[in-house]
Curated annotation (Swiss-Prot):
Assigned keywords, A-Z: Ligase, Phosphoprotein, Pyridine nucleotide biosynthesis
Protein name as annotated: Nicotinate phosphoribosyltransferase
Gene symbol of the encoding locus: pncB
Cytoplasm found in the keyword field: no
Modification after translation (UniProt): Transiently phosphorylated on a His residue during the reaction cycle. Phosphorylation strongly increases the affinity for substrates and increases the rate of nicotinate D-ribonucleotide production. Dephosphorylation regenerates the low-affinity form of the enzyme, leading to product release.
Length: 434
């Protein structure tokens, strides 16, 4: 792959619009997997996705020009899947399976277009919503977050001269490579790039992916970014997200349906996918509630992704549950992905080594760690805790409780209803990083 001089490209930026999203494949792989399932089973569900800035002290509307934001969103609106991309999706092998995408779904995808957006501003923040069929509005999540993250990076870099930009990227590359050197010391570690949504920029994410490829070889298992997977001949990785149980739960009509909702999602998923895609995401309404009510067949799945519990405590709780179900944890897989930095990766690796199969989905700390890299003192390169979550399904409010109460999403009345139903056991508040 040709390696561009990122600093020079940033400094020589004279074109009218430099698109942040150049392809609908510039998204996380699990979006395509989920949308295929939604297309097949829930085609008539309408949802709203909303931008939520959890870094409340950062006034996004002051940092990012509204006209630039609209121009980038409008550009994404006009994108379509190309013939080359459709051929690749149809012919490539994903998770060891050919034709993971059904021909009818791919035919539908050929004409796919993102739905319109709704953008306003209030008190220094952007209010951004995406309404429409679940199949369509879901696909806005990753591009929207990537656009806002990169626009904020660009705004910060506009203030830097050519030499300062050189120093910035030289330091960031050295910082990244020092992490790679530490990963090399962890035998047989499995790590992948999960950093699309809050990346510094697309070019920087691509450089980080190339650095991991070069630095740790087969220990780098792939990327969640579909476009980068296609362009760099890597595995496209990803399973499923909180939006599935959030929407299914919002659509329920009684307590019995609500109790079954997290497991209905898994049954739906298993109609489409198997093997290493059978990964349980247990924390949408609290991991403890999920494990307490889980049918025995859930223990037969390949693994879990403990997303919001502290890694050591969350992993140990799932290992304990597997043992209670008569399963050998050494044959199971834990995927750690919540706000990982290099210290957390090392600590988690050493703790669970030999106890369970492990994989790490490395996100913002991989693709947007510029802290201390600028010669000029500034906080504008600090990564945001920014999410785009489903907030309504068919007009009903959606809720995410999480194992970390700081990550709870929903209106207060509905949150309390879910807490009363699922319980508050083992939910521990901790500061949100990214």
């Amino acid at each position: 792959m040709n390696h561009p001089d990122i600093a020079r490209r940033v400094y020589n930026h004279t074109w009218k619009l430099d698109p942040i999203i150049r392809s609908l494949l510039d998204t996380d792989f699990y979006k395509l997997l989920m949308v295929q399932m939604i297309w097949g089973l829930y085609p008539n569900v309408n949802v709203t996705f909303s931008l939520i800035n959890r870094s409340k002290t950062i006034r996004l509307a002051d940092d990012i020009d509204e006209m630039e934001l609209r121009a980038q969103l409008d550009h994404a609106l006009n994108l379509r899947f190309t013939k080359k991309e459709m051929i690749w999706l149809a012919g490539n092998t994903f998770y060891g399976r050919k034709q993971i995408f059904e021909p009818d779904f791919l035919q539908w995808l050929e004409n796919f277009q993102l739905p319109e957006y709704e953008l306003t501003r209030k008190d220094g923040q952007y209010i951004l919503h995406f309404h429409g069929p679940w199949t369509h509005s879901s696909m806005w999540e990753i591009p929207a977050l990537s656009i806002i993250s990169e626009l904020r990076s660009r705004a910060a870099m506009k203030k830097l001269d050519r030499f300062t930009l050189d120093v910035l990227y030289a330091r960031a590359k050295a910082k990244m490579w020092s992490k790679v050197e530490r990963l090399k010391k962890l035998p047989n570690i499995k790590i992948s790039d999960f950093g699309t949504r809050r990346r510094h920029s697309f070019l920087w994410q691509r450089w980080c992916v190339e650095a991991l490829k070069e630095g740790i070889g087969n220990s780098f298992t792939g990327t969640s970014n579909v476009l980068l997977a296609m362009d760099t001949d890597l595995e496209a990785l990803g399973t499923n997200a909180h939006e599935l149980p959030m929407v299914i739960a919002a659509l329920t009509n009684n307590d019995n349906e609500l109790r079954k909702a997290p497991y209905q999602v898994l049954q739906d998923w298993n109609r489409y996918y198997g093997g290493n895609l059978l990964i349980v995401l247990p924390d949408t309404f609290g991991t403890e509630a999920f494990l307490r009510n889980a049918p025995d067949w859930v223990a037969d799945w390949t693994g879990f992704r403990p997303d919001s519990a502290p890694p050591l405590e969350g992993g140990e709780r799932i290992i304990q549950w597997w043992r209670e179900k008569g399963k050998d944890p050494r044959e199971k897989l834990l995927i750690f992905s919540d706000a990982l930095d290099i210290d957390t990766i090392e600590k988690t690796y050493h703790h669970f080594h030999g106890k369970v199969r492990m994989s790490f989905g490395w996100g913002t700390d991989l693709t947007n760690d510029f802290v201390g890299c600028s010669p000029q003192e500034t906080a504008t390169f600090d990564a945001l805790s920014l999410v785009c979550k489903v907030t309504h399904a068919n007009g009903r409010p959606a809720v995410k409780l999480s194992d970390n109460p700081e990550k709870t999403i929903g209106n207060p009345q509905e949150i309390q209803r879910y807490l009363n139903f699922f319980g508050n056991e083992n939910r521990v508040a901790k500061p949100i990083k990214t």
